[in-house]
Regions:
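Alpha/beta-hydrolase
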Residues: 1-2, 6-15, 20-21, 25, ...
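Glycine-rich "HGGG/HGxG" loop immediately N-terminal to the catalytic nucleophile
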Residues: 59, 110, 125-128, 137-151, ...
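Short beta-strand element of the alpha/beta-hydrolase
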Residues: 96-104
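The serine-hydrolase catalytic nucleophile loop
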Residues: 105-117
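Conserved hydrolase catalytic core segment
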Residues: 118-129, 167-230
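C-terminal subdomain of alpha/beta-hydrolase-fold enzymes, centered on the catalytic histidine
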Residues: 250-408
Length: 408
């Protein structure tokens, strides 16, 4: 059974962090260095000073505890029982649709916060309502870490699927971006009898291929890309060239990186803050927000660096032993209805014809603003997409058996 969970970081852990911050040694910086070289020294100094003078983790902790937090045990094949933390916000609408929200890196369950009232309460005004479940993935946040090798996409998907079943949701929808995209896509691949529809952002996909999608390939070759699509491809190429170094390191040598991220809070802060700043579309991050995101990683039950292993494990999956290859979720997944949100400043923005290689796309929105963190930057856009998909007349209406999103 699921039990209520209260986030309570020990006083000694907070004190230890303060002591580490107090003796931090900062690097120098070239004259006129900017964001193109990484997190600027001035930003790190400002955040350190704000931590010392103003930031109150207990206030952030109270904000997190205001959500409906729970924990439960999930048995994962070949990995034993894992203690999983999750937020579970039920709607008062009896026919609400069960929805799993899956975060990525450097995100957490906190990303769902702004979505909760938009998704659980709109039924009062005649809109579609959802019961929302947002876990801390294993190795992230307040869920248990994994000590064995080989915990990849199959196991993350299994964990999330079994969590939904344990909560009584035999059929459900999902929403995810970044690793949440990969994990929810894997859920659709492995559990099509349960995962009936999915909304995705921060997507990754390939152009249509002549052998697999000849008509789509021809359409892609003959159709001129829109201005939005051309800008998206340019953004994607720029990220591959100048912004993907973190990914290669975490995909190949996460253990080497872990010493810096575990020993130095400044290293973790700079490593994460660069992504928050670069991947968002001029989102006005407050210092309190940034430090709260950082602290969820620093105080993570599995340690600050455990989350980076998802990159290595997912890209080194052994298909001969049942592992899901990293690129498999970027290809066609059958039996699931998909909605896609494209944000112009995300680091992977693809043409519509490419997105159609992912599966049965029943809704695709091109947002005028926004970056990688869709649920944080523009929760209204994510909620509007879900409404459009599942409302009466929407192309995903009624696909979750017995739960159409309306009062019964």
């Amino acid at each position: 059974m699921a039990q209520p969970y209260h986030i309570a970081v020990p006083d000694h852990a907070i004190q230890e962090l303060k002591e580490k911050l107090a003796v931090s040694t900062l690097p120098d910086e070239l004259q006129d260095a900017g964001w193109d070289m990484g997190t600027p020294l001035s930003d790190v100094k400002r955040l350190l000073q704000y931590w010392k003078d103003h930031f109150d983790w207990r206030k952030s902790e109270a904000m997190l505890n205001a959500m409906s937090n729970y924990q439960t045990d999930i048995d994962v094949e070949d990995f034993g029982t894992l203690d999983i933390h999750f937020v579970h916000q039920r709607s008062p609408i009896t026919g609400a649709i069960p929805l799993l929200f899956c975060h990525g890196w450097p995100g957490s369950f906190l990303e769902v916060q702004k979505l909760l009232p938009l998704l659980t309460e709109p039924g009062k005004n005649g809109g579609v309502a959802f019961h929302v479940v947002a876990p801390s993935l294993p190795n992230f946040g307040f869920s248990q870490g994994v000590q064995q090798r080989g915990f990849g996409l199959r196991q993350y998907a299994e964990t999330c699927h079994k969590l939904m079943l344990k909560l009584g949701y035999t059929q459900y929808a999902t929403q995810g971006g970044d690793w949440g995209f990969h994990i929810t896509r894997t859920m659709g691949l492995l559990y099509p009898e349960s995962c009936k529809a999915s909304h995705i952002n921060a997507t990754e996909c390939f152009p249509p291929s002549l052998p697999k999608q000849p008509l789509l390939w021809l359409q892609d070759k003959l159709t001129c890309y829109t201005e939005h699509e051309r800008a998206g491809l340019k953004m994607t190429e720029e990220h591959e060239r100048e912004g993907s170094g973190y990914s290669m390191l975490q995909m190949t040598k996460p253990q080497t990186l872990s010493y810096a991220l575990t020993d130095s809070p400044v290293a973790l802060l700079a490593w994460m803050y660069e992504k928050l700043k670069d991947w968002a579309d001029d989102y006005p991050w407050t210092d309190d927000e940034i430090l709260t995101w950082f602290c969820i990683y620093w105080f993570s039950r599995a340690g600050p660096a455990a989350s980076s292993r998802i990159y290595y494990e997912s890209t080194h999956a052994d298909a001969s032993r049942g592992g899901i290859p990293y690129q498999r979720p970027m290809q066609w997944v059958d039996h699931v209805k998909y909605g896609v949100a494209s944000f112009p400043k995300d680091h992977n923005v693809h043409p519509n014809t490419w997105a159609k290689t992912l599966g049965d796309i029943v809704h695709h929105s091109r947002q005028p603003h926004g970056g990688h963190f869709g649920a944080v930057e523009h929760p209204d856009a994510i909620a509007a997409d879900l409404q459009a998909m599942f409302e009466r007349g929407g192309n995903a209406y009624g696909c979750v058996e017995g739960c159409d999103g309306y009062e019964k």
